[in-house]
Amino acid sequence: MVLDELISEFDRGLRSLTGISRMSRPVPAPAEAPAAELTPAERTHAAGLMRVNHVGEVCAQALYQAQKLTARSSAAKAMFEEAAREEEDHLAWTAHRLKELDSRPSVLNPLWYAGALAIGVAAGTLGDKVSLGFMAETERQVESHLDGHLSDLPAGDTASRAIVEQMRADEAKHGKAATDAGGIELPLPARMLMRAASKIMTRTAYYL
């Protein structure tokens, strides 16, 4: 049973890194078509933002895989699995949008994935309450980050905006579920360290 689980998670990891993500929900569609085509500068900027979001989803897969494998209770395992499935939709959506923008994922995705996997294992070994608290804080920070992207995306990029809005709704749901399941609030130094690491990742992934 453990071997089957490891093989399944290894397969998910490979799909995350190779761009063969499974989509259980269709790509969110904008409510209205853009008034005009994006300029080259707007496309480049939108692609940078969506590349950052794609990296975030690569990291989410690694985090939740590690936390699921190290979780003590079946309830916590199920929660991490459900979140990972929805985050895989996000991974596929952002990859799809990057292709539409004639861009690509981050060349550093293997590095981001490995780092997130190690962090997820570390959080998981501290127990389910800490691990769920880490999940809740991660989702809060991601939700805030997506709010910033909604303000920063070109006004005419309704396609990216529709994706980010659905991602934000899902992240809020995951964070609340983790808190409701008993996740504890992380100490301030841990939260600050997470924010600092996130800034490094987002600034790098925008370009690379």
Curated annotation (Swiss-Prot):
Residues annotated to bind Fe cation 1: E57, E87, H90, E171
Cofactor: how bound: Binds 2 iron ions per subunit.
tRNA-binding is among the record's keywords: no
Catalysis performed (reactions): a 5-methoxy-2-methyl-3-(all-trans-polyprenyl)benzene-1,4-diol + AH2 + O2 = a 3-demethylubiquinol + A + H2O
Pathway involvement of the protein, from the record: Cofactor biosynthesis; ubiquinone biosynthesis
Pfam families according to UniProt: COQ7
UniProt key word rRNA processing: no
Binding residues annotated for Fe cation 2, in chain numbering: E87, E139, E171, H174
Cofactor annotation: Fe cation
Membrane topology, record value: Peripheral membrane protein
A GO-annotated cellular component: plasma membrane
UniProt KW keywords: Cell membrane, Iron, Membrane, Metal-binding, Monooxygenase, Oxidoreductase, Ubiquinone biosynthesis
GO process terms (BP): ubiquinone biosynthetic process
Bilayer-crossing regions: none
Entry's Gene Ontology molecular function annotations: 3-demethoxyubiquinol 3-hydroxylase activity; metal ion binding
Compartments it resides in: Cell membrane
Main enzyme class: oxidoreductase
Enzyme Commission identifier(s): 1.14.99.60
Family to which the UniProt record says this protein belongs: Belongs to the COQ7 family.
NCBIfam families, alphabetized: DMQ_monoox_COQ7 (NF033656)
Job description of the protein: Catalyzes the hydroxylation of 2-nonaprenyl-3-methyl-6-methoxy-1,4-benzoquinol during ubiquinone biosynthesis.
Name used for this protein in its record: 3-demethoxyubiquinol 3-hydroxylase
Organism: Burkholderia multivorans (strain ATCC 17616 / 249)
